[in-house]
Amino acid sequence: RIAFDEGRVEELNSIVHPLVIAEQARWAAEIAAKDSLAVAVVESALVFETKHAASAEDPAPWRTRFDRIVVVTAPEEQRRWRYIQRVAGLDEAAAAADFDRRNAAQWTDERKAAMADYVIANDDSLEELRDEVQTLWEILKRESEERAGEAM
């Protein structure tokens, strides 16, 4: 919260993002070495927003890091409510303000969805979300198998 309060988000991100990205690459390589058909999933709120490794030659470095990108969307009020419910140590007003600061630093769902390979709307029941995730999981596994078959 200090980084948001003092306007030092970029400084914090410039320290954290390269380390996280390097660890993701190491982890993905480890998984691929064990099973070429494996589907690995990375959860990240700032896939598109991170400035690490973006350049004039490669303005979309996430495309070299991920085979597929899935964006999960939800209405802003629903996301705010969920955030307030799970954040510890803040009263409701402070948690809502913290959500608003974080949300302002992220691209809109619409902007992210336009760049995604798949979009899951998380605006219904948990059961519905699980069904959508399971369906997508099967698609991703099938795509992995098809790519492996093409490589042979």
Residue ranges and their predicted role:
Residues 5, 31-35, 123:
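Short coil/turn helix-boundary motifs
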Residues 7, 18-19, 77-78, 107, ...:
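Short alpha-helical
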Residues 15-16, 74-75, 103-104, 124:
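Short beta->alpha linker loops
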Residues 23-27, 53-63, 88-146, 151-152:
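Small-molecule kinase domains that catalyze NTP-dependent phosphoryl transfer to phosphate-bearing small molecules
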